[in-house]
Amino acid sequence: MGRVIRAQRKGAAGSVFKSHTHHRKGPAKFRSLDYGERNGYLKGLVTEIIHDPGRGAPLARVAFRHPFRYMKQKELFVAAEGMYTGQYLYCGKKANLMVGNVLPLGSIPEGAVICNVELHVGDRGALARASGDYAIVIAHNPESNTTRVKLPSGSKKILPSACRAMIGQVAGGGRTEKPLLKAGNAYHKYKAKRNCWPVVRGVAMNPVEHPHGGGNHQHIGHASTVRRDKSAGAKVGQIAARRTGRRRGAAATLAAKADY
């Protein structure tokens, strides 16, 4: 009988494969949407730019005055390129179009570069949050109160115009362009995230450890496609693949055009 394979062990979410979240600074979110942001603006001060282990983009600690009490509200924002300690940020419908300010999509002109975009009104930021990412406002539809946005993947999405976004591009762009050069650097990179490195190929394993393992030379030995309802220990390879192999003919031509 074979062993419990790596994919099954990861799915069980045991202590070995849990994300290393104990040293992270906290969730990076906008302020909770309130009356002040819907109708005017609130002023905040960037008190610190910090590194968050396990995240590529830096974070900004922003202090706001509480709208009703004599106290300060401290928030963690994903930092935009060009933000600095001591900068004043403005969040709300009537805020200016400046890097780091947070406005609803309906108040942002077409062609503007934005980041940390809400997917649903009040969800406090969901799209274009990785280091160097940005989205672009394409068009507004005043009849349906929606805005068309081009995402970092290149896909275009229609969002409610009341969704908020930060002006600018996420800081930390070009982080992945520097080569790791040695295994030790990769080890420390992934140690801050989770246990997902190094990745051993299935064909390099013994047959007891993986369905692709074993043999006098490294080969799968059977079709690598598996059906969707396959048992967990055999569900490896190309799962429920519609097709395999490189595209040929008209399909390849259409795919090449879509890349440009």
From Swiss-Prot:
Gene Ontology molecular-function annotations: RNA binding; structural constituent of ribosome
Taxonomic superkingdom: Eukaryota
Location of the region described as Disordered in the Swiss-Prot/TrEMBL record: 227-248
Record's keyword annotation contains Ribonucleoprotein: yes
Keywords (A to Z) from UniProt: Ribonucleoprotein, Ribosomal protein
Pfam families: Ribosomal_L2, Ribosomal_L2_C
SMART domains membership: Ribosomal_L2, Ribosomal_L2_C
A Gene Ontology term for the protein's cellular component: cytosol
GO terms of biological process kind: translation
Gene3D superfamilies: 2.30.30.30, Nucleic acid-binding proteins, Ribosomal protein L2, domain 3
Ranges that cross the membrane: none
PROSITE patterns per UniProt: RIBOSOMAL_L2
Sequence similarity: Belongs to the universal ribosomal protein uL2 family.
NCBIfam families found in the cross-reference section: PRK09612.1
HAMAP family cross-referenced by the UniProt entry: Ribosomal_uL2_A
Protein name: Large ribosomal subunit protein uL2y
Gene source species: Arabidopsis thaliana
